[in-house]
Design a protein with these regions (language model features):
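A short glycine-rich, Lys/Arg-flanked "PGG" loop and its adjoining helix->strand segment in the class I
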Residues: 1
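NAD(P)-dependent Rossmann-like dehydrogenase/reductase catalytic/cofactor-binding core
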Residues: 58-61, 68-79, 98-102, 107-187
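Helix-to-beta-strand junctions that scaffold the AdoMet/dcAdoMet cofactor pocket
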Residues: 4-5
């Protein structure tokens, strides 16, 4: 091609949008692939590789070699909404939002219970603030709209926070207020 060499791979770092859908906008869907890095990229050791329906073995091999050269652990996901990590993670974050909204426990207790009880580095509400509540809502919406499964219905509290412009750390307000030295719960 005029802009993209005939051997070039076109990759998307999308965290949830189906690769086959994105590949339809590319000049050559055979060279289109999902290469999902996790934030912060220098710290996180995983790359999720997602093959679209038309993606060739040669394209997968180029991306596999690239990921290995970066020293990352690779996992291969089928082209399904949310792939592996966000298909599992976003329902957990969303359920934490439902639990908070329904008064099951306080923010801190939900985070502490999941952090210590599940041996996670942080609780789901803290993680949502780190990812960005707008991003969490967007991914949850992709899961819900793509599958039609009510288990992916976004929590009203998550929607409310995003509508209020509370996106988490990037706006200094989400489930926690980050304006001071120590984050404080906003509820």
């Amino acid at each position: 091609g005029a802009v993209m060499g005939h051997q070039a791979v076109l990759a998307s770092n999308t965290s949830s949008i189906p690769i086959t859908r994105l590949a339809q906008s590319s000049p050559d869907p055979q060279r289109f692939i999902g290469v999902h890095f996790f934030n912060p990229v220098p710290v996180m050791g995983l790359i999720e590789i997602i093959r679209g329906l038309a993606t060739t073995d040669a394209t997968v091999d180029v991306v596999r070699q690239y990921g290995e050269a970066l020293g990352k652990q690779l996992v291969f996901a089928n082209d399904a909404p949310g792939f592996i990590v966000n298909r599992v993670l976003m329902p957990m974050i969303n359920e934490a939002c439902f639990a908070l909204g329904e008064g099951v426990a306080t923010m801190r207790d939900i985070d502490t219970a999941c952090q210590l009880g599940l041996n996670h580095p942080m609780g789901p509400l803290t993680l949502a603030d780190f990812i960005g509540l707008d991003t969490c809502l967007e991914i949850t919406n992709v899961l819900f709209q793509s599958t039609g499964d009510p288990k992916f219905r976004p929590a009203p509290l998550l929607q409310k926070y995003v509508e209020a412009g509370w996106f988490g750390r990037k706006t200094k307000r989400g489930f926690y207020d980050y304006s001071g030295d120590v984050p404080q719960p906003t509820r």
